[in-house]
């Protein structure tokens, strides 16, 4: 099955390379408001059930009249003016994991250990409210169906919570690897969270993000996850992004631990996680046995995992967000999507920051994933970008069904042939 790229060049319309273009036929240039239009595509996802291929939607004026297989729609609406809508017709995709406050960074593809000091640390002065607002503006312009944003600075949370043009979850990020500081750090985080809960409005809601299993002490991790579970706050945790994270939990050392800033960490990993590393210990197993998976956090990346890890995630009912372009650019490995899908784990797509993911456009993430997983049914990718994302960020998936309003944002056209 192939997506095909079709572009539009009528009425002087320009094409934004950051978005998917639309496609029309000459018959569509001057449509009668009461003449049905049959829009066809390679993959149709109506927001219900699974996606189908091929697909089509009949639109009359600005209202959806029917959706289904093109042959059946041609039979039901023989006088409909047919046009190709593009590769995909579906509700807008969700960017389920990103860092909007890094939107002023330049994209750089570098090995993970080079990227952190040369990009993240060197460019830290670029982070802040202005960058986050610019990133949020980009998502709005792209017509994103929702966002899962990791927020580090309180002033960024204040600014983003006030926006009414986005939906999804803003996850307040907390990190501190010293167990003796856990109560103090938790108390400060709780003070912020309780104030922000009073500022929530329809659209963006509040969440919590303990950074990683090795930058948050075992005590703080448990305090945060228990609090989130009790308060109904969604969680996101970065887990198993780089191969050396797995090595670190097995041996207590390796490049990831050795390249840390010593003044910011205890002397040993055992002090951080409250147990000795071991050959069978993984970040996922650690979180599970600590009781954190019981809070059903969304786990981000999950590239370097074992079959037992996948089984634990499935049993706990945790969702996973994969960021294919970022993982590729930082040489982290490839997320085992088929294995997670076989285990019944809900998968969503995110871009990570523009510094590693290049853009905030999830449609481009779908394009890249289609190349990365040639054996994976593209219907799975589309559903993950929509339904999987909405389930992660707590949104409602729009439906393409009879009587619903048609939106041009339902047209997805890939930027290149695959």
Curated annotation (Swiss-Prot):
Assigned keywords, A-Z: Hydrolase, Menaquinone biosynthesis, Metal-binding, Zinc
Disulphide bond pairs: none
EC number annotated for this UniProt entry: 3.5.4.40
Swiss-Prot/TrEMBL GO biological process terms: menaquinone biosynthetic process
One Gene Ontology MF term: metal ion binding
Cofactor note: Binds 1 zinc ion per subunit.
Needed cofactors: Zn(2+)
Record InterPro entries: Amidohydro-rel, Metal-dep_hydrolase_composite, Metal_Hydrolase, MQNX/HUTI_composite_N, MTA/SAH_deaminase
Active site: 241 (proton donor)
Binding residues annotated for Zn(2+), in chain numbering: 97, 99, 238, 352
Pathway(s) where this gene product acts: Quinol/quinone metabolism; menaquinone biosynthesis
Pfam families, per database record: Amidohydro_1, HUTI_composite_bact
Enzymatic reactions: 6-amino-6-deoxyfutalosine + H2O + H(+) = futalosine + NH4(+)
Family the UniProt entry places it in: Belongs to the metallo-dependent hydrolases superfamily.
Protein name in UniProt: Aminodeoxyfutalosine deaminase
